[in-house]
Amino acid sequence: MIPIDIVERGLQDYAACFDEMQTFTARRGPDTPDTIWLVEHPPVFTLGLAGDPAHLLAPGNIPLVKVDRGGQITYHGPGQVVAYLLLDLRRRGLFVKALVDAIEAAVIQTLATYNVASERKAGAPGIYLSSGPHAGAKIAALGLKIRNGCSYHGVSLNLAMDLSPFTQINPCGYAGLETVDMVTAGARDASGRAVDANDWQTVSRDLANALVAQLQQRAQAHPAEAATA
């Protein structure tokens, strides 16, 4: 089983992290370890390759960074857990669809650990609350880039955020889409304590461990047939 390193990078400027992801992927060799970076960003909007700038309704003083992932516009900020997956998909024998499925399953698994019920939506990547007063609201977004069979970018899970910047955009291109965090969803740990921003490290580690478990479950027997983008 091919290991996956987990690296806690803490608070980091988005543009600098984006540059590092591109450089890491461009310099990969056959023996470069697969890794998951756990990051928190200062406030920033990011717009995907095919993103429509019209979905940025009111930028205010939050910078916009155009990036090479799929998807539309999203927001990153303090209190959000971001996991970047820098993986050699061919070596792991993973197709892109299996990677997306693993990411979404890991988020659902992590939220369930904190007593938050969530689900996928067909045709709308990400994870959404499945019950309660905020049913249908988005709590996690994902976007990926595959280059020479290797992935970067990843998934963001809203933990304890100022959610107001999401009202300045059409999140992921959907006008009026409600966006929530784990605090709003009433997340609680195993002891019944309500989670807050101080749980960032614990939640990020839980998400990373769930990602590793889901990815290992989906490893294929024939790596050469995997991702070719």
From Swiss-Prot:
Keyword Acyltransferase among UniProt keywords: yes
* Pfam families associated with the record: LplA-B_cat
Q: What class of enzyme is it?
A: transferase
Record EC number: 2.3.1.181
Q: Name one GO molecular function term.
A: lipoyl(octanoyl) transferase activity
| Major localization listed first in the record, in broad terms | cytoplasm
Instruction: Give the pathway listed in the UniProt entry for this protein.
Output: Protein modification; protein lipoylation via endogenous pathway; protein N(6)-(lipoyl)lysine from octanoyl-[acyl-carrier-protein]: step 1/2
Catalytic activity of the protein:
octanoyl-[ACP] + L-lysyl-[protein] = N(6)-octanoyl-L-lysyl-[protein] + holo-[ACP] + H(+)
What are the residue positions of the site described as Lowers pKa of active site Cys? Answer: K138
**Positions contributing to substrate binding:** R69, G70, G71, Q72, I73, T74, Y75, H76, A141, L142, G143, G154, V155, S156
Provide the BPL/LPL catalytic domain boundaries: 30-223
Q: GO CC annotation: what is one? A: cytoplasm
| Misc remark | In the reaction, the free carboxyl group of octanoic acid is attached via an amide linkage to the epsilon-amino group of a specific lysine residue of lipoyl domains of lipoate-dependent enzymes.
What's the protein here called?
Answer: Octanoyltransferase
Organism whose genome encodes this protein: Ralstonia pickettii (strain 12J)
